[in-house]
Amino acid sequence: RGHSDTGKTTALIEAAVNAQKMGILPVFIVTEMKWSWEHAKEMGLKFEEIKDDDGNVIDYEGHFLYADRGTLNTIEEVAVHMADLIDEQSKGNLPFDMCFLWDSIGSVPCDLSVRSNKNNNEWNAGAMSTQFGNNLNQKILLSRKENSPYTNTLVAINKVWTMKPEHPMGQPKLQNKGGMSMWYDATLVVTFGNITNPGTSKIKAIKDGLQVEFAKRTNVQIEKNHIGGVQSRGRVVMTSHGFLPDDKKAIDKYRDAHKDHWLKLVGSLDFDLVEEGDLSEDPITPNLLD
């Protein structure tokens, strides 16, 4: 969860890439409609482009399933889609472990909101609680029992909003759109960025006046962890190819590994890196550009 452009989609695609490597079937549910196949390909997602007679890309195929707002326009439709796939899996028609990847909770309303032509947050939260908290989340947890033939996982991006302080000496709080049902059922919650702002800084590659975004540095915090029990906070560097540790050796290694990519964008491998922006008041870690 987190504000816009803080690394959430990067984390989701990394999960999908690793799922493919493990033989797990990624199931994309894209209701945010900011999906980029090119970005996914850069990060290592495996798929084939399907072209028409004129050479135009009309579809994509591979070891994954994909659905978006073309068919999923409400919380209930997302839930039915997931439930149908789990049923097909139980019948043996989808003989894979599945990793559902939803981008994002808070981007679609509930059926009642649509029928009433009002995007009511309380109705949406109620639908999330009914469809997921009391139903699908439990099915996913039950798939982790030893006697279950398949194991399913849900990785979801949750849109957020900032609640103002309740009193003059209070602090603003980050709240999930769609209510707290997913928070309560989650085994791992990661927050990217800060409470009141994105909490990122841009790292630009500069050569002869040309500026290209090289990466972003973002705050990250493990707010809930029922897997290893460890909660921590720090910073990571996100690039178009995935995450990097926040240190100079890692970014130098990345720069060298993708030199053809940067040569194409910048026109040279001899460029300067300049960091711009303010990560706010979170703990300072060594600057990766030092």
Language-model segment annotations:
Residues 24-124, 128-131, 277, 282:
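Conserved inter-motif catalytic segment of the P-loop NTP-binding fold
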Residues 125-243:
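Phosphate-binding/switch region of NTP-binding enzymes
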